[in-house]
Amino acid sequence: MGRVSFVLRLGIFSILMAWSVAGPALVRGADQAPQVPPLRVPVDQLDGIQRATIILDSYSYTPNHLIVQAGKPVELLLTSITTITPHNFLLKNEAAGLSIERDVGAGRTVTVQFTPMKPGIYPFYCDKKLLFFPSHKEKGMEGTLEVR
């Protein structure tokens, strides 16, 4: 009986130690966007449009920080890779003349076109939410458009 008790206690201790090391990272990582460096969106030499693709996943945009040039058109391809959860893309700043709100259904792709005229840093986010649960923005689905 003593050997079984020791093995059982050792097993429980091992599980608790593993959870104390890996558990917080697993829980924290569930709702946070992956760390991706800012994307400098290139200007197409043929038509002058700045094009980028943003992947919408479970509560994240990738990339979540884009750098564009003021006064040049921007075209964003918003691609949802979720199978059930719909998302949206909101980029609103009245002073900068930005008012974009597009729904992106699960597994769908939509295109957003605009021309940012005023340099600055502008947040974009998803405001979808289910009942009393936190919104997608509250779960980390937000990003930054940096206009230079």
Question: PLM features: what roles do these ranges have?
Answer:
Residues 79-106, 132-143:
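Histidine- and aromatic-enriched segments that form or immediately flank copper-ligand environments
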Residues 51, 73, 84-88, 121:
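Exposed beta-strand and adjacent loop surfaces of beta-rich binding modules
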Residues 34-46, 104-148:
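Extracellular/periplasmic metallocenter environments
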Residues 43-73:
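N-terminal edge beta-strand
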Residues 56-58, 78-82, 116:
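Non-cytosolic beta-sheet module surface loops
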Residues 1-53:
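Extracytoplasmic entry segments of secretory-pathway proteins
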